């Protein structure tokens, strides 16, 4: 992985290897510059949470086990799409927010809410699509409205 963006390259490289070690097919399509108007720690939080969740879910899938990652930067906006296979149904809480299915729920289930909070820093959005059984898609858009350059 060599996009020139060290934060993204490191995280994607780590999760690609972790997925493949678990027998999960990992595909990525990444088109981003070295510098973007988003803090590296924020992009790391989003990517790390999404890819960790995807790897955990895909590992439990019965048939196809895959993760597909697309990251695109265009006109100061960043689009991150993660698709993955999973088994079973999603559990939703109040407000349709996803809930963890892990037994130790008190120590889990903070990933997607933290992704939402981070996206909101950039007036961004998080959309989840699980309309197709066994196929989960999450889309995160960050808007680079500031003229300040952040690396």
Where are these regions (language model features)?
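Glycine-rich nucleotide-binding loop
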Residues: 88, 131-139
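Glycine-rich/acidic phosphate-handling loop/turn and adjacent ATP-lid/helix
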Residues: 78-109, 149
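Glycine-rich ATP-binding loops of the HATPase_c
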Residues: 123-130
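Conserved ATP-binding N-box helix of the HATPase_c
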Residues: 40-63
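Short beta-strand/loop element within the Bergerat-fold HATPase_c
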Residues: 66-76
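Short beta-to-alpha transition helix within the HATPase_c
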Residues: 4-22
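Conserved short strand/loop->alpha-helix "switch" segment adjacent to the catalytic nucleotide/phosphoryl-transfer site
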Residues: 4, 27-46
